[in-house]
Amino acid sequence: VVFDRQGNLYVSGGRSGRIYRVGPGGGSAQVVAQIEAHTRTLPDGKTQQAIVANGLAFDAKGVLYVADTARGAVWKMPVGADGKAGKPTLLAQDRLMDGADGLAFDGKGRLWVTSNERNALVTVAPDGKVEEVAKNGSEGPLEFPAAIVFVGNTGYISNFDNPRRDNMDADGKGALDGIGASIAQINL
């Protein structure tokens, strides 16, 4: 969810690819944009990723950005003063953004994307160039990073990793993988 300058609330619709808007006074949600549906098979060969409209963020000019988890992409679209969105255009699509989830702009106007499938953070330049900034183990504990928000020069990243027993031996003994829900930080 994200608010625009006029107080409209925007909500992503996940698999539907829809972006909804609720006006400042509340009421029913209106569909204002649509990202085309897409499904991708994950590396395990079994799991299907079909979430196309996920994290949302506005830049300083009022352009709406949408994380496309299934494609590993970010879309952008103009939003008019009436809260209606224009046609989505692809800003970037890159394997570095596999599992694109949360979006946020820092104080310098850089777009940050959490890549949950890669346990990474990337930035996307206005020309669509994608750069990896942190990966699990390099800047802190990133375990299925989901959302990101900046407060001053500090980015806070929510991790949704669930502890699981993936390394069990035949007797059912093994290490508990995953750190569970947590918050990571990155300082600019």
Task: Label every PLM stretch briefly.
Residues G23-G27, P78-G83, V124-K129, N187-L188:
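Short loop/turn segments that connect beta-strands within beta-propeller blades
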Residues K84-E117, T123-G128:
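A beta-strand-loop signature enriched in Asp, Gly, Thr, and Trp
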Residues G17-Y20, G72-V74, N119-L121, R164-R165, ...:
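Structural signal for beta-propeller blades
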Residues A29-A37, A85-Q93, E131-N136:
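Beta-propeller fold detector
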Residues D4-I35, L64-R71:
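Surface loops at the rim/top face of extracytoplasmic beta-rich domains
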Residues G14-R15, T69, V79, N116-E117, ...:
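Short loop/turn segments immediately following the C-termini of beta-strands
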Residues F160-G178:
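Short, conserved, GDST-rich strand-edge loop motifs in beta-rich repeat architectures
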